[in-house]
UniProtKB/Swiss-Prot annotation:
The family this protein is said to belong to: Belongs to the universal ribosomal protein uL18 family.
Keyword DNA-binding assigned: no
GO molecular function: 5S rRNA binding; structural constituent of ribosome
Taxonomic lineage of the native organism: Bacteria, Bacillati, Bacillota, Bacilli, Bacillales
Function according to Swiss-Prot or TrEMBL: This is one of the proteins that bind and probably mediate the attachment of the 5S RNA into the large ribosomal subunit, where it forms part of the central protuberance.
PANTHER family: 39S RIBOSOMAL PROTEIN L18, MITOCHONDRIAL, LARGE RIBOSOMAL SUBUNIT PROTEIN UL18M
Record gene name: rplR
GO CC term (a single one): cytosolic large ribosomal subunit
Gene3D superfamilies reported for this sequence: 3.30.420.100
Record's protein name: Large ribosomal subunit protein uL18
Keywords: Ribonucleoprotein, Ribosomal protein, RNA-binding, rRNA-binding
Species: Staphylococcus aureus (strain NCTC 8325 / PS 47)
Subunit organization: Part of the 50S ribosomal subunit; part of the 5S rRNA/L5/L18/L25 subcomplex. Contacts the 5S and 23S rRNAs.
A GO BP entry: translation
InterPro entries: Ribosomal_uL18_bac-type (IPR004389), Ribosomal_uL18_bac/euk (IPR005484)
Disulfide bond positions: none
Length: 119
């Protein structure tokens, strides 16, 4: 009997494989993206200290509106870039979380780039 492929399990394996070579430092922290069916979350993480430096999500009161999911991802990208700039962070390492660079993940990344983050 053929079993159905669990997309999230494959994504988690891909993310673990990529994370072996990808880490953030204090000078160049990691921008991590998590995508659920309804919301999108972004964190800027210093892996040396194990500390989250900034975060934004589509659940935040200033972002949450009745917009499409791609539009919300764009707003989250702009918000995380603004919070990073407030903390003095200009360069980051982009961690797409095992997701394809398409749709909401791409919209978040491009909005963060346009708002001043370099990666």
């Amino acid at each position: 009997m053929i079993s159905k492929i669990d997309k999230n399990k494959v994504r988690l394996k891909r993310h673990a494989r990529v994370r072996t070579n990808l880490s953030g430092t204090a000078e160049k922290p990691r921008l991590n993206v998590y995508r659920s069916n309804k919301h999108i979350y972004a964190q800027i993480i210093d892996d040396n200290k194990g500390v989250t430096l900034a975060q934004a999500s589509s659940k935040d009161s200033d972002i949450a509106t009745t917009a499409t999911k791609v539009e919300l991802a764009t707003k989250v990208g702009e918000a995380i870039a603004k919070k990073a700039a407030d903390k003095g962070i200009k360069e980051i390492v982009f961690d797409r979380g095992g997701y394809l660079y398409h749709g909401r993940v791409k919209a978040l990344a491009e909005a963060a780039r346009e708002s001043g983050l370099e990666f």
